[in-house]
Amino acid sequence: MNSQEQNARFVEWARSYDAVWWKIARLYAPAGEHEALHQDLLIALWHAAPLYRAQAKASTFIYRVALNSAMNWSRSRTRYGRRHVALDEKSAQAPSKDNESDERERQVEQLYAALATLSEADRSIALLYLDELSYREIADVLGITESYVGVRLNRVKKRLMERLGKENRQ
């Protein structure tokens, strides 16, 4: 494959999976660093794109690159003491007039907060499940068996329900 084809592939993937990049950035980076991680994920994809060999689905390859890059990024921030609590981007915005929209946004924020308390591996499984990947696809992305995906996913769901239940009671 020539460089022009590789560039076209990268641009297509970057556009098609933009929502995935943002979800992963939001899940693995503090609020003030979402943009930085998003850019790092795109750079990782740029470097990895020539390695794609169509033995797996493109989405499997893309998720694997993105999740591994995000976990490495998160570990490097923790290792070097750069992990901090940033101001929530939403707190500076004017309140919305739509109560239903506000409630939905609050629920999404609660879900992301609960997901952030999980281990990196559990966050990855939850994200892939929420993105409606099949157990087989999740197994391919993470390099584990389908049955283990089921076991881990059940544990993750229980933990999330416990954490979300505690938040709703407070």
Question: Language-model segments: which ranges?
Answer:
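Acidic, proline/glycine-rich intrinsically disordered inter-domain spacer in sigma factors
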Residues: 1, 89-116
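Sigma70-family region 2
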Residues: 3-4, 27, 31, 42-58, ...
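Structural recognition of an alpha-helix C-terminal capping motif at a helix-to-coil junction
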Residues: 36-43, 56-68
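Hydrophobic positions on the alpha-helical face of helix-turn-helix-like DNA-binding modules
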Residues: 41, 65, 125-126, 138-139, ...
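Arg/Lys-rich amphipathic alpha helix in sigma70-family domain 2
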Residues: 51, 67-85, 104
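DNA-recognition helix of helix-turn-helix
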Residues: 67, 142-167
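Short amphipathic alpha helix immediately N-terminal
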Residues: 117-137
